[in-house]
Amino acid sequence: MCTTISFAEPEIVLGHGRRVLFVNPDDLQIFKEIELPPDLGLKCHETQSQESCPATATSTTAGKEPGGKEQQLAKQPEEGGTSASGSVATSTSVQNVAYSPDGQLLAVTTSGGQKALLLYRSRPENARLLSARPLARAASAVRFCSDSSSVLVTDKTGDCYQYDCVEVEAPPRLLLGHLSVVYDILWSEDQQHIITCDRDDKIRVTNYPATFDIHSYCLGHREFVSGLALLTEQHIASASGDKTLRVWNYIQGKELLQHELPAPAVRLLVRQLEPEKVFQAAVLFYEHVDALGLYRLERSSDDTWSVTATQLVCAEAGSWSISNFTLTSDRIYITGAENERLSLRVYDIATGQPTTNGVPEGWLKMVLDGLGANEEGAPPFIPEDLSVWFKKRFDNVTDYLERKKRRIEEQKQQKC
C-alpha cells in the first residue's frame, strides 16, 4: 500500500488506501475528500488494444512494443472476487495523486485489484469524477502538461502514455518507452520536451510531439535517478541513489553542478525562493540518521550553480519507516509507518524540529480517521521496500580466480 502527500497551493493533498483528503494548510482542517468507488467500472474503447485495457485482456501475450519488449498480461479479477488461481483479489488503493497546473483537475492512479487513471474536476465544487480509464500496469509517475490539457502516466515497465484531459474518455497514446522502471517525469513549460529518469541511471530528454526523436541525455549518475525538478526553461535538478544532487542544462545534456549527499536519495522536491535564481531542494534519504536534507541552490549571472546552505532534518529517523513528505512555506509534513500503522508528523522548516505551533490538538487523529487508517480491520501499512531500486551486482571473477589459483597449486604438487 502506498501513501502520497503533496502541496498544491492552497491545499495539502493526502492519499492512502481508498481515500484522498484535501487539507487547508492554514488551519489544518479537512475541507474536501474523495473515496474510491467500490467498482471503477473500467471499460475498453474499441480502439484500445488489450495492452492498454487490462480489465478485459484474456490472452497472455499482447504482442511486442517498439524495441521488441514482449508484454505479458493476465486477466484482472473483479475487486473482492477471485483470481484464476483461486486467491482473493487485492483491494484497489490510491497510488499517485497529481494536481493540474490550473488547479482544476486532479489525476489519481490506483493499484491492486483495479489499475486505473481517475480524472476528477476538483474545483470550484466538490471533487467530481470525470473518467476512469484502465492502466495496463501500476503507474510509477504522473505529470500534467503546462496547459492542463493532458496528463502523462509512466508505468513500472518503462512505458509512458499520454491521456487527454479534454476528451476525457479518449484512449491513451503511447509516447515513449524505457527498458526499466521510470521513477519521475517532467514536461517542459513550452511542451517541447518530455524529461524522464529511470532505474538504469539515465535522464532522457525526448522531443514532443515527435517522441521518436531523442533530443539529449543527461548522463553521469551511477545509480537509479529517483527524482527530477524543473528549475528554469533550460535547467533541471536530479537526485540519485549514487548519493548526489545534480543540476543540468537539459537542452545541452550538460552537467552544471554535482553535490555530494550523505546517503542515497529516494525523493526530491524543489521550491522556488527567487524566480529562476534561488531554489530550495529537499531530498529524502534512504536509511540514514538524518531523514531529510534541505539545500539552497543559487544560480549566478554566468549560469553557474552552487549549494550555498545545507540543513539536515533528523525527523526521528530510525524510530519509524518514513515513506513520503511535502513542503509548505513554513512546515515539513512527513508520512511513514509506526508499528505498521500510518503516521504523519509535522516539522518546522526553519529549525527542522517537531512543531505544534498552529497545529490543532487532535489534528493527527482527525486526518488518520479521515484516511481510514484507524478503522478496525484496516490492513497494516508497510512502506515500499526501496532496496530493490539498487542495482544487484554479482562478483563471479573472485571465485574464478580462487579456483584457478587452487588448480595451479594442485598441478604443481602433482609434478613434485
UniProtKB/Swiss-Prot annotation:
UniProt superkingdom: Eukaryota
Organism: Drosophila erecta
Disulfide partners: none
Biased amino acid composition, Polar residues: 49-62
GO biological process, one term: tRNA (guanine-N7)-methylation
Region (Disordered): 47-88
Subcellular location: Nucleus; Cytoplasm
Intervals holding WD repeats: 89-130, 177-216, 220-258, 317-357
Keyword field contains Ligase: no
Subunit note: Forms a heterodimer with the catalytic subunit Mettl1. Interacts with mei-P26 and weakly interacts with bgcn; required for the function or formation of the mei-P26-bgcn-bam-sxl complex. Interacts with nanos; may be involved in mei-P26-dependent derepression of the BMP signaling pathway. Interacts with Myc; the interaction may be mediated by mei-P26 and may be involved in the regulation of ribosome biogenesis.
InterPro entries, A to Z: Trm82, WD40/YVTN_repeat-like_dom_sf, WD40_repeat_dom_sf, WD40_rpt
Pfam families: WD40
Its biological purpose: Required for the Mettl1-dependent formation of N(7)-methylguanine at position 46 (m7G46) in tRNA. In the Mettl1-wuho methyltransferase complex, it is required to stabilize and induce conformational changes of the catalytic subunit. Required for binding of nanos mRNA and repression of translation by the mei-P26-bgcn-bam-sxl complex. May cooperate with mei-P26 and nanos to derepress the BMP signaling pathway. May cooperate with mei-P26 to suppress expression of a subset of microRNAs. May cooperate with mei-P26 to regulate bam expression levels in germline cells during gametogenesis.
Lineage: Eukaryota, Metazoa, Ecdysozoa, Arthropoda, Hexapoda
Note: Wuho means 'no progeny' in Chinese.
Annotated Gene3D superfamilies: YVTN repeat-like/Quinoprotein amine dehydrogenase
Keywords of the record: Cytoplasm, Developmental protein, Differentiation, Nucleus, Oogenesis, Repeat, Spermatogenesis, tRNA processing, WD repeat
Pathway of action: tRNA modification; N(7)-methylguanine-tRNA biosynthesis
Family in the record: Belongs to the WD repeat TRM82 family.
Name this protein carries in UniProt: tRNA (guanine-N(7)-)-methyltransferase non-catalytic subunit wuho
Tissue-by-tissue expression: In testis, it is present at high level in hub cells, a niche for germline stem cells of testis. Ubiquitously expressed in all testicular cells throughout spermatogenesis. Ubiquitously expressed in all germline and somatic cells of the ovary.
Record carries keyword Transport: no
GO CC aspect terms: cytosol; female germ cell nucleus; male germ cell nucleus; nucleus; tRNA (m7G46) methyltransferase complex
